[in-house]
Swiss-Prot record:
Organism, scientific name: Plasmopara viticola (Downy mildew of grapevine)
Annotated signal peptide: 1-20
Location in or out of the cell: Secreted; Host nucleus; Host cytoplasm
Name of this protein: Secreted RxLR effector protein 20
Lineage: Eukaryota, Sar, Stramenopiles, Oomycota, Peronosporales
Gene: RXLR20
The record's note on its domains: Has the canonical translocation RxLR motif, but lacks the canonical EER motif, which characterizes most oomycete effectors identified so far.
């Protein structure tokens, strides 16, 4: 049986090649394998997808490209929500 991560990796590769961006495989310090393209880096998104079981199950149950693209958008919004309070709370004008 194939690992769900292999299927996820294949979907991201397919999505990257369809979008026209040149994709290449990278490995992060903690061993995550992700993709970089001319646009965004998918490593953090993949990590977020693995942390959210509902989002991950959506991808595994409905393996269409549109479901995967929607899940990536949700993961990206979640990442922005995590980072936004930190950016707003930092005042670079303090001396």
């Amino acid at each position: 049986m194939q690992s769900p991560y292999i299927i996820l990796f294949a979907l991201v590769t397919l999505l990257g090649s369809i979008s026209g961006g040149a994709t290449s495989t990278i490995a992060t310090r903690n061993g995550d394998v992700g993709l970089t393209s001319a646009g965004p880096t998918f490593v953090r998104k993949q990590r977020l997808l693995r942390q959210d079981p509902n989002l991950y199950e959506t991808i595994m149950n409905d393996r269409s490209a549109s479901a995967f693209a929607n899940a990536l958008r949700k993961a990206e919004m979640a990442a922005e929500t995590e980072v936004a309070p930190l950016v707003r709370s930092t005042n670079y004008n303090d001396s």
